Amino acid sequence: MLLSKINSLAHLRAAPCSDLHATKLAPGKEKEPLESQYQVGPLLGSGGFGSVYSGIRVADNLPVAIKHVEKDRISDWGELPNGTRVPMEVVLLKKVSSGFSGVIRLLDWFERPDSFVLILERPEPVQDLFDFITERGALQEELARSFFWQVLEAVRHCHDCGVLHRDIKDENILIDLNRGELKLIDFGSGALLKDTVYTDFDGTRVYSPPEWIRYHRYHGRSAAVWSLGILLYDMVCGDIPFEHDEEIVRGQVFFRQRVSSECQHLIRWCLALRPSDRPTFEEIQNHPWMQDVLLPQETAEIHLHSLSPGPSK
């Protein structure tokens, strides 16, 4: 059954990663002005990352998200093959944006004197996973399994493309309420994936692994698995397991809801204190709890269409 589901879900991750050298996006300042191509709508959210507005592409009325990032807030920079210096977020998004539905797509970008503007796809109707859980409480395990599989596939896709997200959390996952598909968003804390140790971290602390809290060092893949464990706990219990550094370092997991023993086992495995004791992505997908995953459309029909959609974001 798992093999058939893998084959059915293959479209979510089978397409190749975007090739930076093959990209057809011209540098932002060589294109028509932003204002002539996009109509800017209401503010969707703001924070340390900048501000995100809803918008419409004038040419075809496509809904988009328009993200403004001030240059003086950008800590990590990258370079495109043509030598253009851009935020690392642009480099990472261009690597992961092609041929895969589980990661938000970068449609365009513009450089301004004091900022960069990123044009991103915007599904409708949509709600982030944080708001979804806040409104509806802990998820049924069948729904959590479908969501978790999709997030896992998105993270695997990123790693296959040489990208480490570094801020996997419920607020950075969008749910397309019509299609039952999830999308990983916000690569502002991301980095190029490497096998050596990382000594910097700009993600969300309560999702960070104990080795970062204790030693300010971590490896990308095992840290991602820890964050996935936090996320799965959040899905099935309705809240994260740890709030303080001491709790993260101690790593004792208590379940506040009735959760199956198989799901508990997977969560505890992902939250192993020793990074080398955590499962690989393949081991997670082969875990007994991960069998019989609903397809996204099945998820929408069974779990989402019967619910009144929350506010769009």
Curated annotation (Swiss-Prot):
ATP binds at residues 44-52, 67, 121, 128. Its cofactor is Mg(2+). Keywords: Apoptosis, ATP-binding, Cell cycle, Cytoplasm, Kinase, Magnesium, Nucleotide-binding, Nucleus, Phosphoprotein, Proto-oncogene, Serine/threonine-protein kinase, Transferase, Ubl conjugation. GO terms for cellular component: cytoplasm; nucleus. The modification Phosphothreonine is found at residue 23. Its EC number is 2.7.11.1. Residues 38-290 form the Protein kinase domain. SMART domains: S_TKc (SM00220). One of its GO terms (biological process) is regulation of transmembrane transporter activity. It is found in: Cytoplasm; Nucleus. The keyword Iron does not apply. It is an enzyme of class 2 (transferase). One of its GO terms (molecular function) is ATP binding. The active site is at 167 (proton acceptor). It comes from the Eukaryota. It catalyses: L-seryl-[protein] + ATP = O-phospho-L-seryl-[protein] + ADP + H(+); L-threonyl-[protein] + ATP = O-phospho-L-threonyl-[protein] + ADP + H(+). Proto-oncogene with serine/threonine kinase activity involved in cell survival and cell proliferation and thus providing a selective advantage in tumorigenesis. Exerts its oncogenic activity through: the regulation of MYC transcriptional activity, the regulation of cell cycle progression and by phosphorylation and inhibition of proapoptotic proteins (BAD, MAP3K5, FOXO3). Phosphorylation of MYC leads to an increase of MYC protein stability and thereby an increase of transcriptional activity. Belongs to the protein kinase superfamily. CAMK Ser/Thr protein kinase family. PIM subfamily. This is Serine/threonine-protein kinase pim-1. The gene is PIM1.
